[in-house]
Amino acid sequence: MPKSMKLLLRISIILVLVLCSCSTNKVVQDYASVPLKKTIFEVPYFSNPAMDYVYKANITVYGHELTGIFIAKKINDTTHRVVFTTEFGNKLMDFEISEDNFKVNSIVSELDRKILINTLEEDFRLLLKKEYLVQEQFENESDNIYKSADGNRDNYLFYSKKNHQLEKIVRSSKTKEKFMLIFITENNIFAERVQIIHQNIKLKIDFNYFKS
């Protein structure tokens, strides 16, 4: 076989391997694909309109910490209102967020940065989302994982087989993880603690239930 043909063969093999490796998202590359058992996954944690969800909040950005109170309230079937205040009650941010809309009611000038607002919009929309349409399912010994497409992103919902509750949501591009939500809950209805951890930027948000 001529050297040029051998080279082309090697290149084609390498391309096949690369394309195959890219076709499976790294989030679920170690999980087995299984037949789809449900097409809708409902998240209960922020869905009760009669409840004010109040948490102590700690936001860490590139080594800088901001602490305060996070309040989320479902104000109608599609929309949540989100307020972040200092521990003394001074309002820092006030948003209204739904599946398709995002409205900034108020924000202090120190936090009024487009990149921060866009990041928080994506974080909070995923946090407060109640219903996910499921296209694929994966599993291992401990979890069922449900994949839900969301525009040019994918959301992976990790449901514990042992505890029978949603413990994590990973948001990713088509190939790699972008950020994750981690839920700690005792009753599968209310999350006592929530963490939002980003992979590409040094941003971590920690919510702990405020017991008055």
Task: Please give the residue ranges for each predicted region.
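Sec-dependent signal peptide recognition
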Residues: 6-14
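A short, Trp-centered hydrophobic/proline-enriched beta-strand micro-motif
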Residues: 45-62
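N-terminal beta-strand/beta-hairpin edge segment
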Residues: 57-61, 66-90
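C-terminal motif of bacterial Sec signal peptides marking the signal peptidase cleavage site
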Residues: 18-21
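Gly/Pro-enriched, hydrophobic low-complexity segments
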Residues: 142-212
